[in-house]
Design a protein with these regions (language model features):
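Bacterial N-terminal signal peptides
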Residues: 12-24
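Alpha/beta-hydrolase-fold serine-hydrolase catalytic core, especially in secreted/extracellular enzymes
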Residues: 261-267, 273-376
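Serine-hydrolase catalytic machinery in alpha/beta-hydrolase-like enzymes
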Residues: 78, 85, 100-173, 329-332
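N-terminal cap/lid segment of alpha/beta-hydrolase-fold proteins
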Residues: 38-99
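Primarily recognizes the serine-hydrolase "nucleophile elbow" in alpha/beta-hydrolase
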Residues: 156-234, 246, 251
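Short beta-strand/loop motif that positions the catalytic acidic residue
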Residues: 239-241
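Acidic beta-to-alpha connecting loop that harbors the catalytic carboxylate
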Residues: 66, 243-245, 273-276
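Short alpha-helix in the alpha/beta-hydrolase fold that links the catalytic acid
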Residues: 249-259
Length: 376
């Protein structure tokens, strides 16, 4: 059974109906009056795609890197080549240094940036007063891989993590963005990275100066990694997935949530019982997709080394990654399928989470959030 974290801040999660009631709307901390329009605009019905045609994003570039693994990401490794990240920024009307706005960073899935998904979410949020930065991790690394399988073998979750934290630094440098209120949102493959970014081990590597996201959202992200170091950044996370999504192992997601909670972050799980994978994508479905990663189990050691359960060597390069993924995945595949009714419900759940984060005190104090979890 999915769990309902009854003490997740001030919001109550009802699993099954998947609606979130945010009593955090009554939060009365400093500056709430100045941010009240976020509550009002996010609580209203989301604008339809047809009404968003006049919202154009701005292509932006900023420094990032391309480490294959967390071990490579270390500053002294020499195996983290510089990369110029690619992204599209959607700014709300009226955003300025005098009126900075909160923001989200979006990480795409294995199929790359989709107009129907990332770009539509970004335009909708921008219309409601939230800046959205859509990262194109594949586009920035076309020299490394182009085909679907080739990209998944050579453009790793660690590289997407590098882009995520580079995006956070970029947004914090802009006077029209409230850098203390930036939420990381990931879809499927990007959702894995959005979850891993909540672990302090990853944050310390990519943001040693203390930059942290105010919240994390993982849409239908496979829960296949276990971090030996369970320290969390302290920022909250919600996982959203479908009850008919075969790429999700609910027990593993529960375990991952418990690890993050033990490390200092609050975690909520929202399940839409009738939904397949990618209910907000472009495919009407249900349509079967290739191989399924749900049986895979990765372990991330304290030094950043990643190992699988069926291969004796670490995931240090594309060959070993291919072997580990090939041995652990199955050929039964999984179903994807757009469901507009589920999309409406997940919109409401996402809005409630963003309201809580944006109307709260901002990024948690980094030192207070870092605590050593009890031994396993």
């Amino acid at each position: 059974m999915p769990r309902s974290p009854g003490q997740f801040g001030q919001w109550v999660l009802i699993v099954g109906t998947a609606w979130v009631l945010a009593s955090a709307l009554a939060w009365a901390g400093p500056g709430t009056a100045d941010r009240g329009f976020f509550r009002l605009r996010l609580s209203q019905p989301w604008p339809q795609e047809a009404a968003l045609t006049d919202i154009a994003g701005e292509p932006v570039r900023f420094p990032s890197s391309s480490p294959f693994s967390l071990v490579d990401a270390a500053a002294t490794s020499g195996r983290s080549p510089p990369t110029l990240a690619m992204a599209t920024l959607f700014l709300p009307r009226g955003a300025s240094a005098a009126a900075p706005v909160p923001a989200v960073v979006m990480l795409h899935g294995a199929s790359g940036v989709q107009h129907q998904r990332e770009m539509t979410y970004a335009r909708q949020l921008s219309a409601m007063g939230v800046a959205a930065l859509v990262i194109d991790s594949f586009g920035a690394r076309r020299d490394m891989a182009t085909g679907f399988v080739d990209r998944l073998l050579n453009i790793t979750e660690t590289m997407i993590l590098a882009d995520a934290y580079a995006a956070l630094r970029y947004l914090k440098s802009r006077p029209d963005i409230d850098g203390s209120r930036v939420v990381l949102i990931g879809f499927s493959y990007g959702g894995m990275a959005a979850t891993y970014a909540a672990f302090e081990q990853a944050a310390e590597v990519f943001a040693p100066d203390g930059e942290r996201f105010a919240g994390h959202v993982a849409f239908y992200a496979p829960c296949i990694a276990e971090f030996e170091d369970r320290r969390a950044t302290g920022a909250p996370l919600i996982m959203l997935y479908g009850g008919k999504d075969a790429i999700i192992d609910p027990a593993r997601c529960e375990a991952l949530a418990r690890d993050l909670e033990a490390g200092g972050s609050r975690v909520g799980i929202i399940v839409y019982p009738e939904a397949f994978h990618q209910w907000d994508g472009r495919v009407a479905g249900p349509r079967k997709i290739g191989r399924n990663l749900a049986p895979c189990r990765f372990r991330v050691a304290r030094d950043g080394t990643v190992t699988g359960s069926l291969w004796p060597f670490p995931m240090a390069d594309a060959f070993n990654r291919r072997m580990i993924l090939g041995l652990c995945s199955d050929s039964e595949g999984y179903l994807i399928g757009r469901d507009d009714q589920v999309r409406q419900r997940s919109n409401a759940d996402l809005a409630a989470f963003l309201e809580e984060v944006f109307e709260g005190p901002g990024v948690p104090d980094a030192q207070a959030a870092r605590r050593t979890p009890p031994p396993r």
